[in-house]
A protein has these predicted regions:
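C-terminal capping alpha-helices of c-type cytochrome domains
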Residues: 1-19, 439, 454
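Beta-propeller domain segments
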Residues: 18-40, 114, 135-137, 148, ...
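Beta-propeller domains
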Residues: 33, 73-98, 166-168, 396-398
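Beta-strand-rich domains and repeat architectures in extracellular enzymes and scaffolds
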Residues: 46-81, 358-365
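Blade-loop segments of beta-propeller domains
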Residues: 90-121
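Asp-box/WD-like beta-propeller blade repeats and closely related beta-sheet repeat scaffolds
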Residues: 142-197
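Blade-level signature of beta-propeller repeat domains, shared across WD40, Kelch, NHL, RCC1
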Residues: 430-460
Length: 460
């Protein structure tokens, strides 16, 4: 965070240099991503009910597949308000948030609605799970808000739910609100919550909830200070203890080993684990314990980031490994300055520019046993086009760039693309993983869930 302030104070372009600066880089990553011959077969796992009006695409706004840790039961959310439990391969409505949260809204914005969900690792005993959803501005006072002179388009709400019977196929229980945050626009909200799946009882990380908070569109709407001021939470990954009560509102805990808790007189909220993101909408862990976050970029760079406690990942003074001016044209990027090291920014471990795709989605390492060829690979892709990528987890190292490879698909043995399969230019691609480590693909355009079921390697 200090890097952001220093940059804004020091690196303001002079009038004489603005003409040169405004040129920007036209092709920041000239190297192309190549297909290396990996083709993975997909098998349709299930079809979700149409929830969009008049059968318009996307048919079902499905964005996340997760599972209940003890049983492995699969769940999928629909941004329009449904949380499904998969029974015998078919979606059964587990919870309709519209009926439980009367102020719930799923517009405006591509990601507004029931954004994410996560089951507490002790769900089988405590019956607790968590969701994020959107409500109209000023529905209630936000714990994380800003001056009334700045409009709020939506509020994102983090809720804890407690079921009466963890084995039930439909929700019956209670809820309590943990916090809400105002957002300038309907984009880049609180689209990801997750627990560290590697943490065991007694570990520091066990039961701590990670929350990806986007910048809410603040930077592109002219309020870049919301993503740079030290006392703000926009553009960060938070880590909280839902069982604690030492937060300012007394509804959750701030883990004592969070990076900014021990800093005397710090303005930085203790909830912050890492900062400097535009939209950290997918967070995961590799088998060796590395935490990764995909960050959707502005106009040029999509990135995979290796997350470390207290690190700053650059937004809004960096997009990937490139400079941007948050007070100028944020659609331009420039080379790093000679004194870049003084800002202590953690750069992506993998990135592609908009020649390849325009909105990254990730990303999961294959942990299963059914397709040995996929072991040691982290899979991700491009949301709109459905283009598919991977990197080797052995190449993930801070300060270096992992080599991105393209992979392709067949469905039931027939070579195709996701665009062809769902009959839409916009695929709306997302990934999921089950309790056995097998991977899945969700396509919002046609409301389908596919399982990765086989792979072959040919020459690229």
């Amino acid at each position: 965070v200090d890097a952001l302030i220093a940059f804004l104070n020091v690196h303001q372009p002079s009038a004489s240099s603005k003409k040169e600066i405004n040129k920007g880089l036209t092709d920041p990553i000239p190297e192309r991503v190549k297909f290396d011959g990996l083709t993975i077969n997909l098998t349709q796992f299930t079809q979700f009910p149409t929830t969009s009006d008049k059968d318009q695409k996307p048919l079902a706004r499905i964005t996340k597949l997760g599972f209940e840790p003890a049983t492995g039961n699969l769940f999928v959310n629909d941004l329009n308000g449904e949380l499904y439990k998969l029974k015998d391969g078919k979606p059964v409505l587990f919870m309709d948030i519209i009926k439980l949260k009367p102020k719930f809204i799923h517009q405006p914005g591509l990601a507004t609605g029931l954004g994410s969900f996560a089951f507490h690792p002790g769900f089988a005993k405590n019956g607790l799970f968590y969701t994020t959803h959107t409500e109209p501005p000023r529905t209630a006072k936000a714990e994380f808000g800003y001056a009334d002179s700045i409009k709020a388009t939506v509020q994102w709400v983090l809720t804890e739910w407690k079921v009466k019977d963890p084995a039930a196929d439909s929700f019956e229980g209670t809820s309590r609100e943990l916090f809400r945050a105002d957002m300038v626009s309907g984009i880049h909200g609180v689209q990801e919550i997750t627990f560290n799946p590697l943490a065991k009882p007694g570990d520091e990380d066990y039961g701590l909830l990670y929350i990806g908070v986007g910048d809410g569109g603040s930077v592109e709407n002219g309020y870049s200070f919301l993503a740079t001021d030290q006392d703000k939470i926009w553009g960060t990954i938070l880590r909280i203890d839902p069982h604690g009560r030492n937060s300012a509102n007394g509804k959750y805990g701030i883990p004592p080993k969070n990076p900014f808790v021990l800093q005397q007189h710090s303005q930085i909220p203790g909830e912050i684990f890492a900062s400097g993101f535009r939209n950290p909408h997918r967070n995961t862990w590799t088998k060796n314990g590395d935490m990764l976050a995909c960050n959707i970029g502005q106009h040029h760079i999509e990135s995979v980031n290796l997350i470390a406690s207290g690190k700053d990942y650059g937004w809004p003074i960096r997009e990937g490994r490139f400079v941007i001016d948050p007070n100028g044209d944020i659609n331009n990027v420039y080379p790093l300055p000679a004194d870049d090291s003084i800002y202590n920014i953690a750069y992506p471990v993998a990135a592609f520019d908009h020649d390849e795709g325009v909105a990254i989605t990730g990303g999961l390492e294959y942990w299963g046993n059914e397709i040995p060829r996929l072991k040691g690979k982290y899979f991700f892709g491009d949301i709109p086009s459905g283009r598919l990528f991977y990197i080797s987890t052995a190449d993930i190292q801070q300060g270096k760039q992992a080599d991105i490879k393209e992979w392709r698909i067949s469905i039931n043995g027939v070579s195709t693309t996701l665009r062809e399969a769902c009959g839409s230019k916009r695929v709306d691609l997302h990934f999921g993983r089950d309790a056995k480590g097998e991977l899945y693909i969700l396509t919002k355009a046609d409301g389908k869930l596919y399982k990765l079921t086989g792979a072959e390697q040919t020459k690229g």
